[in-house]
Amino acid sequence: MPNITWCDLPEDVSLWPGLPLSLSGDEVMPLDYHAGRSGWLLYGRGLDKQRLTQYQSKLGAAMVIVAAWCVEDYQVIRLAGSLTARATRLAHEAQLDVAPLGKIPHLRTPGLLVMDMDSTAIQIECIDEIAKLAGTGEMVAEVTERAMRGELDFTASLRSRVATLKGADANILQQVRENLPLMPGLTQLVLKLETLGWKVAIASGGFTFFAEYLRDKLRLTAVVANELEIMDGKFTGNVIGDIVDAQYKAKTLTRLAQEYEIPLAQTVAIGDGANDLPMIKAAGLGIAYHAKPKVNEKAEVTIRHADLMGVFCILSGSLNQK
C-alpha cells in the first residue's frame, strides 16, 4: 500500500482509499485491521473530510476509520473502538449522530420494525390537533407534554384528554388527516426495509383513524392504536376497548415477532415518549428518536439530528463489517 497523506484524501469520505486507516489531525496511516461486529457509527448529512477532521481534533484522539459509505444523502463512517460519552457529546454538538455497532440487526435478514406514530412516524400529536379544533387545545397539549415526559400515568391522562372532546364534531378527524405531516424519511425507510423483506408496524397510543390511514398508505404489516368512540357524528369523550399503553406496545412487538417467526435480535423499536421505553427495551435494537430527555437517558441508541433515514443508516452498519 503506497503512503497516503491527508492531502490525498478526497472531500467525499466514502471515496477514501486505503481503509481501514488511522486519522489524527493531518496524519493518515493505513492499517491492517479486522473489527468483526465491534465499533461504532458516526453519520450525518454533509459529513465530509473537513467536518470529520474538525471532529477528530476536538476529540483529541486518533480515530480508526474502518469503512465509509453513503445512505442516500447521509454519509456513514464506521469507527473502531468503543463509543464514549465524550465522542457522543461532541458528535451532537456537531449536529451528527452516533450508534454503537454491537446489537444492530442484520439488514439482509428478515426483521421487524415497530414504530410509535405521533412525533415519530408523523410530525404531530394527533390528540393535540384534534383538541385545537375542538376548542380545548391548550389544556390538552400541556397534559400530552407531561405524559410524554413520563410525569403522568399514560392511560389516565389519555382518558382525561379524550374526555375534553365530548360533543365535538367527529369530522375534525378528517380535517386533521387531510393535513397529516409525515415525518421526513418515513416513506423511504419503509420502502427500503420492505424491499429487504422486513415487516414494518405501528404501535401507537394515538388513534386508529390515523394509524389505519398510514397502514393503507404505506402498506404496513400491522397497526395497533386507540379507537375513539363516536355516536351520531359526535365524540362521546370515551375510548373503546383496552388502551394501547407502554406495556401494550411492548407486547405488540413480541407478539408480531412471534407471529412472523422473527428472532427478537432482528427487531427494532423506535419512539420518542416515555410510553415507548418498554418497547424500546424489548427490541433487539431500541432507538429513541428526537425524544424526551428521560427517553434519551434510558435508551442505548438515540437519533438526535437525522430524520427517519437515520434508522437505515444505523442498520446499514451490519453490511459494512470486516
Curated annotation (Swiss-Prot):
A molecular-function term among this protein's GO annotations: phosphatase activity
Recorded superkingdom: Bacteria
Protein name: Phosphoserine phosphatase
Keywords: Amino-acid biosynthesis, Hydrolase, Magnesium, Metal-binding, Serine biosynthesis
Catalysed reaction, written as an equation: O-phospho-L-serine + H2O = L-serine + phosphate; O-phospho-D-serine + H2O = D-serine + phosphate
PANTHER family given in the database record: PHOSPHOSERINE PHOSPHATASE
pH dependence: Optimum pH is between 6 and 7.5.
